[in-house]
């Protein structure tokens, strides 16, 4: 089938969309990716698989701007996309994010498309209201987590259950201690020493991802334990200022996906921290748990439902309430994993291998083909 993927944004900012590009290309579909930005290395690999890539002008940044400016940028994006699609022939559009669908507007309702949604948006009621007709009209809706599928089906009155497409990388090195190709990252990791037990957090740094309990525990354990953080600041609030100034950690510069997997290959334990402040975080679906477990890294996670149903269910690590656990309890988790490391690592690998992205996509597109 001829599939045109549309993404308003930088491809590497949504690793699951990169996985979709590879999976569709490798399962015999003719893929055209339309996006704002893509790293040259990723573009080269996709083109080798026959993926056509078109980039357009920078997507509209609507934050902190007046309503007239936002409206102009929305319309500019909409004009660019539909002008490109007018010249295309495709069987289906793959709308790669809810934001992309909203920016494309009601004209999308006249097309045959599938909709991939990454977040739950429970704190954005206006967005949910506007998404409802777009989700209802989609031939298929893809979401990354089972409970999100249940919630979306109820909210949007969907005629059928969404396809669960976990946020698992389509390609993963799987091998520990692979070479670090980014010189800055290499310098930092090698500077920690060969015997360092790296407790790694990859992702946004902010109050929604409270790392203070882990930082205190790792600090008290002392050498060879090291807390390493690779990510970007999610804000400049008091939490972030306090954490950056008063806690012990090693900061690694962020790199584009999938290069960040090189850092994870040198870790000992992964961290997944989500607070209980919304349905979106309660039923989280982080790609990092697959990125960690692909290397057999056990994970210490907060006890939100999305992590208990994955990491906890497979015993791929330990889930604990970061908000109430004291430093001694977090230390105990780290030491328990350290003591029974091979067992936790085997369970982590089992969790990773239990998901077959290609099979999910093949089955979903068979359903689409039968609807022609």
Mark where each language-model region is:
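N-terminal subdomain of nucleotide-sugar transferases
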Residues: 1-41, 88, 140, 213-222
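Conserved donor-binding/catalytic core segment of Leloir-type glycosyltransferases
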Residues: 4-6, 142, 169, 173, ...
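Short His-centered aromatic/hydrophobic patch
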Residues: 95-100
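A short, active-site helix/loop in glycosyltransferases that binds the activated sugar's phosphate group
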Residues: 103-104, 125, 137-177, 309-310
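A charged, aromatic-enriched C-terminal amphipathic alpha-helix characteristic of glycosyltransferases
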Residues: 180-183, 262, 322-329, 338-370
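Nucleotide-activated donor-binding/catalytic signature segment of Leloir-type glycosyltransferases, i.e.
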Residues: 225, 237-269
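Acidic donor-binding loop of glycosyltransferase active sites
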Residues: 264-282, 297
């Amino acid at each position: 089938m001829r599939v045109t993927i549309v993404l308003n944004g930088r491809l590497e900012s949504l690793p699951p969309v990169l996985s979709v590009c590879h999976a569709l290309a490798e399962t015999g579909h003719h893929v055209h990716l339309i996006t704002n930005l893509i790293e040259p290395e990723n573009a080269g690999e996709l083109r080798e698989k026959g993926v056509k890539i078109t980039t357009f002008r920078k997507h509209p940044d609507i934050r902190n701007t007046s309503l007239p400016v936002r409206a102009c940028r929305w319309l500019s994006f909409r004009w660019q996309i539909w002008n490109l699609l007018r010249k295309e022939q495709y069987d289906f559009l793959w709308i790669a994010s809810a934001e992309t669908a909203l920016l494309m507007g009601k004209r999308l309702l006249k097309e045959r498309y599938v909709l991939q949604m990454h977040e739950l948006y429970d704190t954005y009621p206006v967005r949910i209201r506007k998404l409802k007709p777009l989700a209802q009209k989609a031939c298929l809706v893809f979401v990354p987590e089972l409970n999100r599928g249940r919630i979306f089906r109820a909210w949007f009155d969907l005629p059928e259950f969404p396809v669960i497409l976990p946020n698992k990388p389509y390609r993963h090195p799987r091998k520990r201690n692979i070479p670090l190709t980014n010189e800055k990252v290499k310098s930092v990791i090698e500077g920690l020493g060969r015997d360092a037990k790296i407790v790694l957090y990859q992702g946004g740094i902010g109050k929604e991802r409270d790392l203070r309990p882990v930082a205190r525990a790792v600090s008290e354990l002392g050498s060879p334990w090291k807390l390493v953080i690779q990510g970007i600041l999610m804000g400049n609030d008091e939490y972030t200022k306090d954490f950056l100034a008063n806690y012990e950690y090693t900061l690694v510069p962020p790199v584009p996906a999938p290069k960040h997997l090189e850092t994870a290959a040198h870790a000992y334990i992964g961290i997944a921290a989500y607070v209980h402040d919304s349905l979106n975080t309660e039923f989280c679906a982080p790609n990092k748990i697959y990125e960690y477990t692909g290397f057999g890294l056990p994970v210490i996670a907060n006890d939100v439902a999305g992590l208990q149903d994955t990491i906890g269910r497979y015993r791929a690590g330990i889930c604990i309430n970061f908000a109430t656990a004291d430093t001694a309890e977090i230390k105990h988790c780290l030491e328990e994993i350290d003591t029974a490391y091979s067992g936790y690592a085997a369970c982590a690998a089992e969790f990773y291998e239990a998901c077959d992205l290609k099979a999910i996509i093949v089955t979903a597109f068979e359903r689409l083909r039968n609807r022609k």
